[in-house]
């Protein structure tokens, strides 16, 4: 026999909020539109999930189920006999699981095309057929929302819609979608709205997320994140982090920081010309060398008195020069030779005279 608690994956003491969360998770998991390759199994599971939610979400039905099981809901007690007064004397009839699903999601089936108005119907003027004839398919638009967090009481489980495309001027087109959901109470409330504009051939998408009192706005251009603000203030760190998460390059920052580098060179210019005057002072040492030249002696020699000059001339006459000495000695030698020659001749004459005698 099927255990409804096991079908939803909750404990027997689970709260009504836990029952809702469990149904949302299991219904989206086993919806036939999401399981085209295993449709029969998905339909069986989807039906069990709807039955479990119908019983466990109603306090009276849950109490009977806890006491007598599913048979108590069918109008009979256990042990083959009727031992209690069942409020469902003729048995409880389960509703269509699709009806349960649509009711849970605000009266509309998120997997049907009726839930998402085709934005191109009115724009191109060719509806694909009556709303009731639109069939579900594996490529259902809602499959993108299967990862949304739990819905809570007090809010529609899921609410979204599109406005048809329309002209905005300058060849622009626009669409809009929104979603809101929350947990228990207002603390976990989250709202997402997305608007898309096609202006001058560029697709501008603005995504606004409001969660726990904080507003986050992301603006994309042709799929590239261009700006991100939190509570109306641009957050460059959050923008860079989101771009890294998406694997996109971080857009160029605003021109605000650019002037800062431009000021640095202007401030650095005055110090650089400072060393240039130093080489200009190098010729200074040439001026200092002029006083070191001694006075010329010529002017002092001209001022010597005439008497001193005459005394010097007399001294020069008294002292023979170096050139005179060699001439005197040479003369003496020559005179000595002539004298000896003459003496020899005289002696020869004397000898010859003696021999004659």
From Swiss-Prot:
Primary location class: cytoplasm
GO cellular component: cytoplasm; cytosol; nucleus; perinuclear region of cytoplasm; Z disc
Encoding gene, per UniProt annotation: Dnajb6
Domain J: 3-69
Positions bearing Omega-N-methylarginine: 136
Keywords attached to this entry: Chaperone, Cytoplasm, Methylation, Nucleus
Phylogenetic lineage: Eukaryota, Metazoa, Chordata, Craniata, Vertebrata
Record protein name field: DnaJ homolog subfamily B member 6
SUPFAM superfamilies named in the record: Chaperone J-domain (SSF46565)
Keyword Membrane: no
Region: Interaction with HSP70, residue numbers: 2-147
